[in-house]
Amino acid sequence: MLPREAKNNPCVGCLRGCCSKLLVGLCGYDVWRIANALHIRPTVFVAFARRDETSRDDFGPYDFGLDTSASTYHMVLNVRQGTDSTYPCIFALDLPTHEVRCGVYSSRPISCQSYPLTFAGEEIIVKPSLCPDGAWDLTKVNLLYWREELGRHNMEWSIHSFVVETWNKKVMKEAQLQKLDFRPFLDFLLDVYQRLELARVEVPTEAWSGIWEQWRWFTAKQVNPLLLQESESIAAKSWHWWLKCIRKAVAGH
């Protein structure tokens, strides 16, 4: 992966407050990384946003249930009460200079890592954001780096969607809860991503760029490659092996 060039990083010195004005969505990999880096339980930093639907057919790709009811949830980074109606991220550090810095920068969620860049088709664009006008000049950033990073992020959200779908099939057999309890879901995530990490470290470093690029090819077509039959996928050795490892980790093997 290419190193990020700090000299062209518009976030340095910015006071626009994305760390106190936005809810940050979390994928399972985010939860696993932060919990392991800080040696804390996910319940310390994960909050749950509720979305009621009429049936399970209306679930979004990242929505999970806890029982047979139609109530669904998705994970966001917890916040604390701030001033002026702001809700700073639980990990935001307020400096004497009135600047804000991330307390978990090396383990920050992938949504934070990519903000405010995204793909529009095959192009990288700056999506509407809290950033000052003109802060992100795409002629001055390393687009090769960002293409790989955004491809990696696409992959992690696809894996999360696959993990959530597997969980939802599991809990459809459970009776409706009398009291909400998110701990079983969080434990499921930690177990899956711990198994997946054992496989992740076995992927050759030089193989990742190709895997992310191929993943992006699928997600650009609104396809999660984990939902395809193996014969429909790519025959490249690292790609095929990685997909197999993900499926095995989610299945509990």
Region spans (language model):
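Short loop/turn segments that flank or connect secondary-structure elements
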Residues: M1-H253
